[in-house]
Structures are given as C-alpha cells and as structure tokens.
Amino acid sequence: MKTVARALSGSARAMARKPMRFTDLRTVQLRPPIVPTHRNFEVSPDHPLWAFFPDGNNSQTCYREASDLDIQSRAWTTAELRRKSFEDLHQLWYLVLKERNVLAREVRLADAINERNTHVHDQVDEKLLLTQKRIKQVLLERQTAFERVQTFTQQQQEYLEEFRQRYLDADASQIASYNEKLIRLQYAFFGIQPQLEDYNWETDINERFVDGLNYVSHIKLARYFAQNPDVEEEIGYPLKGVVEELPFLLRDPSEAVEEVRALRQSGAQVKLDKIDVLPFLRSALQAALEQEGRM
C-alpha cells in the first residue's frame, strides 16, 4: 500500500507545472496601459437604461437645462382622460412614468454636481404627478361604476325571479293584473315595446331584447304547464331558441303552444345560429306588424 502511495505522489510531482522563469525581464513586451474613459466601452443602442435619458440613445447630454424643458405644458384634465380607453390610459401612464424617471435622474445628477437650479424640473414633475393622480381617479370611477352595475344586475335577477314566482302563483282573479305588470316589466328591463309599431327595428332588436324574449316566453310557458301538466309531458321544457319563444310574445299562451307543437311535428329547423337570430326576429316582427295592419 505504501508503494502505491509513493508512486502516486511521485507522478503528481512530475506532472506539476513548473514555475515560469524569464531569463531576461528586459525583453518582456508589455502592452501600453488603457486610459479609463467612456470611449473604451461600447453600449448597446437598445440598452434598457437609455430609457432614463430624454432622447434615448440619441441623447447628446445627460442633463437638460431649464430652458430645454417644456414649461408651457399642462396636466391632462379629468374630462379628457374620461374619454380615453383602458389601453390609452395604460399607455399614457407609462409615458408619464418614463418622463418622471428621466426628471428624477436629472435632479439626482444635479445634486451630485452641486447644481441646485432644479425647480423647473420639479414643476414639470408636479404636472406629471397630477396627471397620474387623475388617471387613477378615472380608473376608480370606472371600477366603482362596474361594481354598481354588478350589484344592480344581481338585484335585477333577484327581482325577476321574485316576479316569476308571484306570476306563477297568481290565481285567476290576479292574472290579468300580473299580465299588465309583465308588459311594463318587459319594457323596463328588456326594452320590449308594448306595441309592434313602436319598434326601431335596427336598434331595439338586440341582445337585450333576446334575453327578455327568453324570460317572458318561459314564464308564460311555465304557468301554462302548471295549469296543463299533460301538455308539459308532450311539449317538454325548455323552448328551443327564439323561433319557439317568439309566439309567446305575439299570441296567447295556448295558441303559442299549438304553434310550437306544429313546428316540432313538421320537423322544421328551429335552432338558429347566433348570427341569424336578430335578422330572424326583425323579419318575423315586421311580418306580424303587416299582418296586424291587414286585419
């Protein structure tokens, strides 16, 4: 074992690098020293730190004098910001933030070189800060409005469900009154006009109208099924789109049920693509209005 250790130790000594020796140090050629200067460094033109300079990599100076700043500028008004989209506000926020960073760097540099004349920089920064505060105010207004809409939508759904239950529970002496209430409700909540001639076909027939048609048709159908349980087994629930729902808006529930039964027995296609729903409703309602005029 000792023999092996000696052999390894001898090999290690033999392979060890010998120190370098110069016979004559005067013959060694040294490179001239590099003078430290910014010209010795190449900075990428798209380096992120260029964002802290007013003109990016084209900036000619690292500090702008007061005369170089736009002192005639003003902050954005709240009214102007309210007309901007979320994308515009997002972009404007970061443009303002970038300019504030440039000003902050220049003020810090001025402190380092004992340049105290930075009050103009501070004035411009105050305008930018005011713009940021107003952007936050506009976003807060939109957030508050959104939350109120959400709350109203929830309250609306609760009211619609409550009315549906009262409509289904109404007895024969109350149903006429509830039908009148339903007419007022469908107009107030969904824009469904009491008379066909009151419609603006291009603006009134929309997604809101479709939602109202779904609500009105199913509430009438549910009451009809409650009074005629044998029909429920035959027709089934729910209705298949606006083609089957529209008769409940235009006619008595019993007549509407017969029309739905005839549609299904004929094998006609009643499920429409979404893009065809509004054109179908406009055409069908106009045809119903013309038929009323001939009667």
From Swiss-Prot:
<comment type="subunit">
    <text>Component of the mitochondrial large ribosomal subunit. Mature mitochondrial ribosomes consist of a small (37S) and a large (54S) subunit. The 37S subunit contains at least 33 different proteins and 1 molecule of RNA (15S). The 54S subunit contains at least 45 different proteins and 1 molecule of RNA (21S).</text>
</comment>
<keyword id="KW-0809">Transit peptide</keyword>
<dbReference type="Pfam" id="PF06984">
    <property type="entry name" value="MRP-L47"/>
</dbReference>
<dbReference type="GO" id="GO:0003735">
    <property type="term" value="F:structural constituent of ribosome"/>
</dbReference>
<keyword id="KW-0687">Ribonucleoprotein</keyword>
<dbReference type="InterPro" id="IPR038340">
    <property type="entry name" value="MRP-L47_sf"/>
</dbReference>
<protein>
    <recommendedName>
        <fullName>Large ribosomal subunit protein uL29m</fullName>
    </recommendedName>
</protein>
<comment type="similarity">
    <text>Belongs to the universal ribosomal protein uL29 family.</text>
</comment>
<dbReference type="GO" id="GO:0032543">
    <property type="term" value="P:mitochondrial translation"/>
</dbReference>
<keyword id="KW-0496">Mitochondrion</keyword>
<dbReference type="InterPro" id="IPR010729">
    <property type="entry name" value="Ribosomal_uL29_mit"/>
</dbReference>
<dbReference type="GO" id="GO:0005762">
    <property type="term" value="C:mitochondrial large ribosomal subunit"/>
</dbReference>
<keyword id="KW-0689">Ribosomal protein</keyword>
